[in-house]
């Protein structure tokens, strides 16, 4: 015969003229919480439900799932990283960590589980693979330091994977001439000039204001003091730069100084590059500006047309020198691709080709790590075998060696 449950006797209190029964329990944080009900039976059920809830919370604190701990880790990072960086973390975490492992308890995850989660990323870019790999390791090492794990499954996970990115070459002198002639008088012209002849990052160029452009001095220069970023497609200008080294003063050549003077004479905005209302560009506005370059290239395009209710895919490869059918004013004059970062890469490469000291180039480029500059330097200096032949020949067969050996 089932044992009849015993209902405890509770203290009765009066609240707003109504008689209640009351008891107190400790919540998951150790704080005392009062529970009320009009009958002892109802209060007893409330008490049991509250205790189960507290036990569940305490269990999950000691044994969180991957999804729960990832969310907690992101909250902890929010005090240290920018909103844009945190958004990137959250997106990668959601798609590549929580999706395959989110329902597992942290202590259940094995090295094989992590390797399986990384398999789809092996087909993605090397950069994305490295980011997700870093996030997984940060999460599990954090849990280990918090004594939630006895063994860290990340200990033997390799950091290498993904498809290596195709490195963009610097634009040649001829390509620079063609590019500038193509977009002369168009919206991206000033941005391109700043990238080619001052080497500013995109976020630095879009945040540049006239109070940081010094043209009426013996040596015209640009002072990098602000950075642009987009949050929900809206521009946010900040004095927080990418690194400490990004804060720099860059002397500019006459061609860029003249271009900036011409732009300043007609500008009604505080920003060097602004929209029609004088405000900094949003992310979508910048994409539209850059599209002036893309539509003039011979890059292969894909279109979709609806025929009899079906979507038909068309691939078109424009011919150099021809005009766009729907807009004859657009001529395909660029037989090479251009990216915003490529402008900066061209600036750095040209400085190194001109023999500028790598340490000076590091300062002008705003590189915090000299390795970044030296990697470009090595490529510029040592990627031409015909120019290195005499050096290598001299090193391996110094003058007089053969004669001395014969003697």
Model-derived regions, located:
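Catalytic-site neighborhood detector that most strongly recognizes the C-terminal catalytic loop/helix
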Residues: 170, 365-390
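Basic, Lys/Arg- and aromatic-enriched nucleic-acid-binding interface segment
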Residues: 126, 130-132, 145, 149-151, ...
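Short, charged hinge/linker segments at domain and secondary-structure junctions
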Residues: 108-111, 141-163, 314-326, 390
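C-terminal secondary-structure termini that scaffold catalytic or DNA-interacting sites
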Residues: 1-2, 217-218, 230-232, 236-247, ...
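DNA breakage-rejoining catalytic core of tyrosine-based enzymes
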Residues: 107-108, 149-151, 162-181, 223-225, ...
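Short, basic (Lys/Arg/His-rich) helix/loop patches that form interaction surfaces
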Residues: 126, 181, 185, 198, ...
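Short, Arg/Lys-rich segments that mark the N-terminal edge of DNA/RNA- and chromatin-recognition modules
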Residues: 1-38
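N-terminal core-binding DNA-recognition domain of tyrosine site-specific recombinases/integrases
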Residues: 33-35, 62, 74-148, 165-167, ...
